[in-house]
Structures are given as structure tokens and as C-alpha cells.
Amino acid sequence: MDEPIFTKRELAIMQILWGTNEELSARVISEQTKISKNTIQAVLRKLLEAKYIKTSSIGYSGTVLTRLYRPVMTEEAYLSTVVSKATMERLISNFVAQQENSEYLDHLDNLIQAKKDELS
């Protein structure tokens, strides 16, 4: 799998797939976006060929058998490929500097400590 640079349509479809724990058909995806069903099917084929999604099973869409799709790449993995480490460091630094809620900062501190413990 190469580093993804999704088009607007690919990203829109991936966000729909990331937004649910269920496997989705092209018809269900088309109900959640203004993209035409034919375009959705073409984009799904492209994402499938690139191995960013997989056909998880065959199910019914009404009375018709259809492929059901599930993402292979997580949204977190995608975001980490899009945002460089230097950009991420500046983003986090600015985010923390803007925080006025000490409870939220404590929560972030706990997340960081848990990751450090995991790495030790």
C-alpha cells in the first residue's frame, strides 16, 4: 500500500466508511453523500484495487445481492501519513498552549504516560 493521497470523492467515501463499524454497500454510501451511485462504484473499485478497502462480505441491498465494504486503512493511519512529524509537533504545541481546561490537559498527560509505559 503506497502512501495515500485521496481525491475529494475518495476521501468522502473513506470518511463514510470510517464513520461506522458496519460494512456498507454502495447504495448505503450513496444515501449518505451527494455523489452519484455510478461514481461511488467507480471510486470503490479504485480504493479496492489500491487495498485501502476490502470486500468484507456479500449481502442483500433490498432484494439484490451486493458487495459490502469495510476500510482496511484506519483514519488514524491516513492522518499520520498526511501530517508530517514537524507539522504534528507544531499542531500539538499550539493546541496545548490554547487549552484552558486543566482536566483535559490531565487527560492528555495520562494518554502520554500510558504510551510511555507501553513503550517501556
What are the residue ranges of the model-derived segments?
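Basic amphipathic alpha-helical segments that dock to polyanions
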Residues: I13, I40-A50
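Short acidic, hydrophobic short linear motifs in intrinsically disordered regions
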Residues: E22-Q32
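Short alpha-helical "packing" element that flanks the helix-turn-helix/winged-helix DNA-binding module
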Residues: E10-I16
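Amphipathic alpha-helical dimerization/coiled-coil segments
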Residues: E76-S120
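Short, cationic-aromatic polyanion-contact patches
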Residues: E3-E10, S25, I58-S80
